[in-house]
């Protein structure tokens, strides 16, 4: 019997991640696709924030944001990021580290078009991470954008996706008496495959 049967069974970490997320969608109170995204600034100081993961592809994880935000500037400078997804209802988590590239083509256009009208207008109105005088100033900008853009605003150039291509994916499941189960998939770039290792809790 394989040491990885059950929750950790299979050799494709992206498929395991999709299965876990599907389970969390049935059990979490809200936002099962929320991730704590970590980046570093120019001085090496870390930054973290919650964002929503929008897709698990065959070889990458995708989220969307404002390209003028602090997170985007830090990603552009380092080309790397990490994140953790944690589900209290399942007592499981996934940790990912990897390289980041932009997704600002048709896929980003399609996702932007799928958002609610108010969310699309909000993306245009928000100068993310910049100082804001007041909430009323923000709402005034939303009203102005609404009048300018009409009912079908296109994706702004300063807004789009990022694709995290992992070098490492760790799956963690709670165990009794802190004897948790942990397996890490590490990318072998020379052979384009994964080395799978059980880790001590």
Swiss-Prot record:
Gene3D superfamilies: Electron Transport, Fmn-binding Protein, Chain A. Its cofactor is FMN. It comes from the Bacteria. One of its GO terms (molecular function) is FMN binding. Keywords: Flavoprotein, FMN, Oxidoreductase, Pyridoxine biosynthesis. FMN binds at residues 49-54, 64-65, 71, 93, 128-129, 172, 182. GO terms for biological process: pyridoxine biosynthetic process. The keyword Oxidoreductase applies. Pathway: Cofactor metabolism; pyridoxal 5'-phosphate salvage; pyridoxal 5'-phosphate from pyridoxamine 5'-phosphate: step 1/1; Cofactor metabolism; pyridoxal 5'-phosphate salvage; pyridoxal 5'-phosphate from pyridoxine 5'-phosphate: step 1/1. The keyword Flavoprotein applies. It catalyses: pyridoxamine 5'-phosphate + O2 + H2O = pyridoxal 5'-phosphate + H2O2 + NH4(+); pyridoxine 5'-phosphate + O2 = pyridoxal 5'-phosphate + H2O2. InterPro entries: Pyridox_Oxase, Pyridox_Oxase_CS, Pyridox_Oxase_N, Pyridoxamine_oxidase_dimer_C, Split_barrel_FMN-bd. Pfam families: PNP_phzG_C, PNPOx_N. Substrate binds at residues 54, 111, 115, 119, 178-180. Binds 1 FMN per subunit. Its EC number is 1.4.3.5. Homodimer. PANTHER family: PYRIDOXINE-5'-PHOSPHATE OXIDASE, PYRIDOXINE-5-PHOSPHATE OXIDASE. Belongs to the pyridoxamine 5'-phosphate oxidase family. HAMAP family: PdxH. Catalyzes the oxidation of either pyridoxine 5'-phosphate (PNP) or pyridoxamine 5'-phosphate (PMP) into pyridoxal 5'-phosphate (PLP). This is Pyridoxine/pyridoxamine 5'-phosphate oxidase. It comes from Ruegeria sp. (strain TM1040).
């Amino acid at each position: 019997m394989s040491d990885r049967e059950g929750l950790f069974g299979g050799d494709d970490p992206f498929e395991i991640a999709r299965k876990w997320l599907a389970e969390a969608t049935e059990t979490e109170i809200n936002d099962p696709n929320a991730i704590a995204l970590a980046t570093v600034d120019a001085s090496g100081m870390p930054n973290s924030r919650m964002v929503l993961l929008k897709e698990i592809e065959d070889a990458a994880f995708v989220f969307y944001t404002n390209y003028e935000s602090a997170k985007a500037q830090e990603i552009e400078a380092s080309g790397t990021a990490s994140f953790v997804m944690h589900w209290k209802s399942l007592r499981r988590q996934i940790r990912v580290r990897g390289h980041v590239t932009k997704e600002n083509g048709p896929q980003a256009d399609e996702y932007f078009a799928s958002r609610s009208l108010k969310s699309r207008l909000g993306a245009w109105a928000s100068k993310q991470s910049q100082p804001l005088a007041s909430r009323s100033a923000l709402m005034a900008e939303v009203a102005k954008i609404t009048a300018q853009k009409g009912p079908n605003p296109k994706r702004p150039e300063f807004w789009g996706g990022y694709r995290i291509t992992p070098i490492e994916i760790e799956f963690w499941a709670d165990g009794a008496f802190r004897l948790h189960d942990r397996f890490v998939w590490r990318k072998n770039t020379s052979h384009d495959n994964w080395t799978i290792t059980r880790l001590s809790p």
